[in-house]
From Swiss-Prot:
Its main location: membrane. CDD domains: ATP-synt_Fo_b (cd06503). This is ATP synthase subunit b. The chain crosses the membrane at residues 10-32. F(1)F(0) ATP synthase produces ATP from ADP in the presence of a proton or sodium gradient. F-type ATPases consist of two structural domains, F(1) containing the extramembraneous catalytic core and F(0) containing the membrane proton channel, linked together by a central stalk and a peripheral stalk. During catalysis, ATP synthesis in the catalytic domain of F(1) is coupled via a rotary mechanism of the central stalk subunits to proton translocation. Keywords: ATP synthesis, Cell inner membrane, Cell membrane, CF(0), Hydrogen ion transport, Ion transport, Membrane, Transmembrane, Transmembrane helix, Transport. It is found in: Cell inner membrane. F-type ATPases have 2 components, F(1) - the catalytic core - and F(0) - the membrane proton channel. F(1) has five subunits: alpha(3), beta(3), gamma(1), delta(1), epsilon(1). F(0) has three main subunits: a(1), b(2) and c(10-14). The alpha and beta chains form an alternating ring which encloses part of the gamma chain. F(1) is attached to F(0) by a central stalk formed by the gamma and epsilon chains, while a peripheral stalk is formed by the delta and b chains. It comes from Gluconacetobacter diazotrophicus (strain ATCC 49037 / DSM 5601 / CCUG 37298 / CIP 103539 / LMG 7603 / PAl5). HAMAP family: ATP_synth_b_bprime.
Amino acid sequence: MLHEPRFWSAVAFVLFFVLFGKKLWTPLAAALDSRADRIRADLDEAARLRREAEQMLEDATRERETAMVEARALVEHSLIEAARIADEARREAEAVATRREQMARDRIAASERSAVREVRQVAIDVAIQATRDVLATALPAGADHAIVDRAIADLPSALSHRAA
């Protein structure tokens, strides 16, 4: 056993750790503790980042749902507004068509009245001319004074009948 290299290696190993173990163990433990602290800090940071990401995901989901609700409401409002505008445009078009139709009827009525006046005036002119022609050919030369005198005499009674 004293001549075994394994025995002496084990003794050297134990002596090495007995003599230098405390001095070697402290920095080694400090390095391992420091690494463990860094890993723990990294894990804490990763957990914090995960919580932030989950919170951001919840916020984004909530905002998306809110935006969808607002978009639906906006589309619904737009459809209602479009229907209202179309209805208003239809009513305005009907009102314009009615006004134009009434204006056309008024123009037609005015044209009819004007045509009737013109026809009456032409009829009166023709009747007057025919009367002149008939009177000029049928009446003797002295009869015109007697007719005018009789018309002047009948004038007050004709005016009184007309006023009543």
